[in-house]
Structure formats: C-alpha cells, structure tokens
Amino acid sequence: MHKYDVVVVGGGHAGCEAAAAAARLGANTLLITHKISTIGEMSCNPAIGGVAKGVVVREVDALDGIMGRAIDQASIHSVILNSSRGAAVWGPRAQADRKLYKQAIQEIILNYNNLTVKEESVDDFLIESNNNGELCIKAVITSSGEHILTSKVVLTTGTFLRGVIHIGEQVTPSGRMGDKPAVELANTLKKYNFKLGRLRTGTPPRLDRGTINWSILQEQVGDNPPVPFSYLTEKINQPQVSCFITHTNENTHKIIRENLHRSASSYLDDIIAPRYCPSIEVKVNKFAEKSSHQIFLEPEGLDDDTVYPNGISNSLPIEVQREMIKSIKGLENAEILRPGYAVEYDYIDPRELFHTLETKKIKGLYFAGQINGTTGYEEAAGQGIIAGINAALSASEKKESFVLHRTDSYIGVMIDDLVIKGVIEPYRLFTSRAEYRLAIRSDNADRRLTQKGYDISLVSHERYSVLQNKLESIKQLEEKLGSLTITPEQLRSYGIKISYDGIRKTALDLLSYPNIDWNKLQEIWPELSSVTRWNGKMGHTKADNRAKNEICEAVEIEAKYKPYLIRQEADMKFLREEINTQIPINFNYSQVKGLSSEVIEKLQTIKPATIGIAKQIQGITPAAIVSILVYLRNRKTKVAASFA
C-alpha cells in the first residue's frame, strides 16, 4: 500500500492550492482527481478576482499560492474595480483565457516538488480511534478498492457531492457538465454523522462569437497597462481584448415569465441559490419593476469562439434559452454552443470545522471550498491554502497551527464567518463583511502575510527577498519625504490652504491630505520628479515601472489612511488580545456557574478555541462570556499556585 503525509481529494481551485501548500511545506502529498485533464478547470465564469475576491487572490499569492501566477499567464482583460474610490475597496479582476489558465495550473501542479497526482475517485475512509477516543483518519479508500495510507485528508469536492444538473425538466446526475457526481463519498460523510445540507448554483449558456452582432454593442475596454495579481509577475504578456455590454428587455422578460414553471427554480425553491449571483429567472421574478438587466459578453479565450454572457445564468429548457437569447440586442442571430444549467449539491455545515478547517468529528480530516457552503474560485482557493497548510503542519507533528484572523486578512474574515456563523445560502465575500477593511487591502497583502508564511517555511526565498526589497524602498521613500518640510504660509503660494498654525509640514504629512498627490508634491519640490524612477538602494527583481508604482502607491495609501489606521489599530489590538484568550479543546462548560443549558449545548457543539470566537456565537450573552473568562482565570491562578 502507498503512504502519503497528506492526501487532497479534488483538483479544483481549493484542491490545487491545498496540495501545493502542503507540498511546499515538505509534506509528501497526493492529489486525487476524477480527471487529470480537468485540473484547474474554470467551471463557471472565465474570470478571477473582483471586489474582496481580488484581495483573496493577492493574499493567496502572498503565501506563495498559485492562483495569482496562473491568472497572470492567462489574463486577457484586466480591470481594477472601484478604482475611483478608496484603496480599501479596490477589486482587481482579470478575464481569463480558459485554456491558458488551465494550462498554467496544470503545468505548475504536475511539476510540483513533493506532489503526486493520481486519476481516481475516493469513496470512503479508514477510520480508527486513538488513545483519547478520538476518531482519526488512517487511509482513503478509492472506488477501485485501493487503500492509500495517510493521516491527513483534505476534501475539496466542489459541486460533486451528489451533484445533479437541471436543464428545464431534464435532470442528470452530474457534478459538472460531463462529469459524474461523488455519490459514495457523500454517503460516507453522512455515515459519520456530518450535517449535510443542499445548495445550488448555475451557469449561463455559452454563445458562438461569430454569430454575435458586436457593432451595435457597448464596448468595455480593460485597464492599460493591465495590473498583475502576483507580486512576482513583471507584466501581463497576453494580448488584451474588450468585453461588451448588452441588456435584456421586456420581450426577454415575457419569454422568461411564460416559462418559469419549466425552470428548475420552480421546483428547487427549497434549495437555496446564490443571493448575490441570481439566475435571470430570479431577477425577472423578484425585480418585476425593472425593464432590463445588464449582460456582460466575456470572451473565453484568444483563439476560442466561445462567449460567456455574464448575467443570464438559468436552467430553462434549451428551446426557451434559444428564444430568450435571440430577443436580446446584438444576439438576434446568436447560436448557443452549450446550454445554461443549474446544479444542486451537498455541502457540510462549516460550523463543524475548526479555524484550521479540520473537522471536529474526525481528526486529520479537512474541508475546503464549496463543500463548506461557499461560492467562487477565490473563496475556494483561500480555504484550500489554509487547509493544506494545516494538514501539512499537523502531519509533521508540529504543534502550531496556521490561522488567519479577521484583523489580518479577508481569508480570516471568510473562515471566521463560516465556522462561527455557518451558512444558509452560498457564501460570497464582500468588503462589507470585513470590519477592518482599511487595513486589509489589495495593495498590501504581501506586507500583511508573506512574513507569516516565511516564518513557517511556506514562502520561497525569492518571494521573501522581493518583499524585503520593497519594504526597504518604502522606508527610504518615506524618509526622503519626511526630510522635506514647508510652512503653511509657504503652501499658500501653491494654492494649498491648511491650518495656519506655523508648524512646518513634511512632504509625507502633506501626502495624507485628500487633495494632495504626487504631482502636487513635485510642483513644490521639483527634486521629487526622480521618484518616477524610484527603485531603492537594494533594487528590485521586477520591472522598474511596476516596482516604482507599487512603492509610491504604498507610501501614498498609508499616508492617507494613517489617521484612520491608528484608531483602527487600537480596536484591533483590543480584539486580538480578547480573541487570543484560549479555551481548552475539551473544556467542560457545565463546570461554569451561571451558564444556561442552551448556552452549554451551543458551546459544547461548536467548541470555540478562544473567547473571541465564543463571543461571536449567536445566543452567547456577554454575561456568559464573563463567566467563562472568570472561570478560566481562576483555574489558571490555581494551577500557578500549585506549582509555587
């Protein structure tokens, strides 16, 4: 029998990040997937990133993950969403050439050190009890009956657990168009008493590029130059193409309304679909007052005639889909290459997980991605990398785990939401979910997380060197700006009015004002024109222009956010101290006086690792938190006294 430190099941976005992370940490890792040819498949939209989501991609990259580098090799239309607003809500997004993205992922995964890929499916586990009576993973059992020994398993099954596809009245067991579902594995999870629920999602029909009348559509041009996701990418090399915009109309809506009874939405209403990415049937039915809905026509590749009409996901019968498409401006003669469909699938209640994404029921078993009730490639990747890291650390018998918090990352926000609050609908990240979004931005993911990754040997020396060079250059530039001073009176000659208190202001001080930018500073201090060639004494391995832009941008953003970040840091410090108060894993809450039976039951079920986590559980009162804190402190005092 073969033996591996870590086995990852599923070759999607979560699985690839989990497998790569475990392998980077030195774990002998096996990635098991139904088809090697579908590793890195973009099952739905051909794009990576977006508001909040783009920050996650940067965070994964900062930890030496692979998604950012792969999309940079496949990017054919790049934009920074919300670029006219503050940096806290910037959303990097890139349209991908599907083939190039999958090719990039496969090239990385199939040549990764410490990583083996096997084409197979997993149906069951070999589980044993340890000396403490805990259930532990000992092996995975494949559909062919093979036992593969391992103590750590990461499940990243996507929409495959008892997946069923719906196109009108046509129902097909499938995890994705053309791929069989994972039925036995779902039964296995049920056997071990995991709480399973049912969710659904959907995808639009794919259109033939050559049958679309592009001349009457609104063109949407990407950013020039396109901005890479990865901190290691010098520039985007692929040719950039435009996307186009059209809209549904009253006739489109009439066709949909007349056929709502034939849509899967009509008989799957008890299975919840994504709230923030609704099907066109839901849009028309829920927002009846709207006369049109926007559709983005997104190319799926440079040499691919397939077009993705973002905004009309549906599960109507194919003949209705054809009629609907032809009612839309520019699509009157459009041909459908593949129909849209809905897919329903099993997910587990993520409250059954620790923040490491290890399950509470079975030691050594981790879940990541849509199996946890999330939606989106980026959310999957963020979970995958955390699960892979912790599986590898645990396999190496290192005591520490790797947990990101709400205060340091969007990944931390997402996982905290999942394991504490759970989900009743497909979970999607937004900036509004992050209380500390001013500090966890798309521009500073490397400065927030790369050191953390390097400290556990997850991050390469190359990436760490790039970060150190960047930090040194930022420091030098801030020192340069801090050495240049001017009085409020002198500023009047440049049309700048600030408080006339007689106190000299540095160039760095001025940069914090909303109406002062680099151009204004260069007007006051012409010698700062050299900042356009700023490269720092240590230099950079990336293209000078991007390095310069990142450094100047970092200094300006930090200057403008500084007053707010100082206040926020005080809040974050208090929160960190509170959330880091540890609660023993097998803590007996019934010993704490004053806790109701309801509170005890919730705490025993969720098993919060810290006071901060316990506070977020619905129904846990401040009085209960105080009682637990007092009990823990008294116990700590008694233990200390016994050793005195």
UniProtKB/Swiss-Prot annotation:
One of its GO terms (molecular function) is flavin adenine dinucleotide binding. One of its GO terms (cellular component) is cytosol. Signal peptide: none annotated. It is found in: Cytoplasm. NAD(+) binds at residues 273-287. Keywords: Cytoplasm, FAD, Flavoprotein, NAD, tRNA processing. It holds the Pfam family GIDA. PROSITE patterns: GIDA_1 (PS01280), GIDA_2 (PS01281). GO terms for biological process: tRNA methylation; tRNA wobble uridine modification. Its cofactor is FAD. FAD binds at residues 10-15. InterPro entries: FAD/NAD-bd_sf, GIDA_C_N, MnmG, MnmG-rel, MnmG-rel_CS, MnmG_C, MnmG_C_subdom, MnmG_C_subdom_sf. Homodimer. Heterotetramer of two MnmE and two MnmG subunits. Belongs to the MnmG family. NAD-binding protein involved in the addition of a carboxymethylaminomethyl (cmnm) group at the wobble position (U34) of certain tRNAs, forming tRNA-cmnm(5)s(2)U34. This is tRNA uridine 5-carboxymethylaminomethyl modification enzyme MnmG. It comes from Wolbachia pipientis wMel. The gene is mnmG.
